[in-house]
Amino acid sequence: MTSNKDKNKKANEILYAFSIIGIIPLMAILILRINDPYSQVLYYLYNKVAFLPSITSLHDPVMTTLMSNYNKTAPVMGILVFLCTYKTREIIKPVTRKLVVQSCFWGPVFYAILIYITLFYNLELTTAGGFFKLLSHNVITLFILYCSIYFTVLTMTYAILLMPLLVIKYFKGRQ
């Protein structure tokens, strides 16, 4: 019989694999942009999604619009990770009832804010605050930003879906 740590390790490996698979299209957009800034493929895709709300940079509107709109698929990938791992995830550390209640309240609140900003909000990085303005001038830093957003949304979606199951396991274990 496998231990809870082994089960969680396997679930984490699946999460990492899905994260890497999910970032491959972002790398493809970056490589296309670096090799051919006026790529017909990029401009064709850009024209298809330009009307959607996105986090963009005026220094590279085509690449950033495509990456931002691709990031809208992160919740779907989070759902797939959840469906592949929900049976194997276990609670390892002892948790208090207070922590469970706080997680059940603040987790969805934070997730709703994150989803609104990343999926439904128009944001121009060159006019944003100092840190984001700095990132908006270089395609590599923009790529890192969009990979970070993708991974954050994927992980948060997975965590929000997993939370009710862990709460049920928590209360069953206390009986």
Swiss-Prot record:
Keywords: Bacteriocin immunity, Cell inner membrane, Cell membrane, Membrane, Plasmid, Transmembrane, Transmembrane helix. Its main location: membrane. GO terms for molecular function: toxic substance binding. It comes from the Bacteria. Disulfide bonds: none annotated. It holds the Pfam family Colicin_im. Coiled coil: none annotated. It is found in: Cell inner membrane. GO terms for biological process: bacteriocin immunity. GO terms for cellular component: plasma membrane. This is Colicin-B immunity protein. It comes from Escherichia coli. The lineage of its organism: Bacteria, Pseudomonadati, Pseudomonadota, Gammaproteobacteria, Enterobacterales. The gene is cbi.
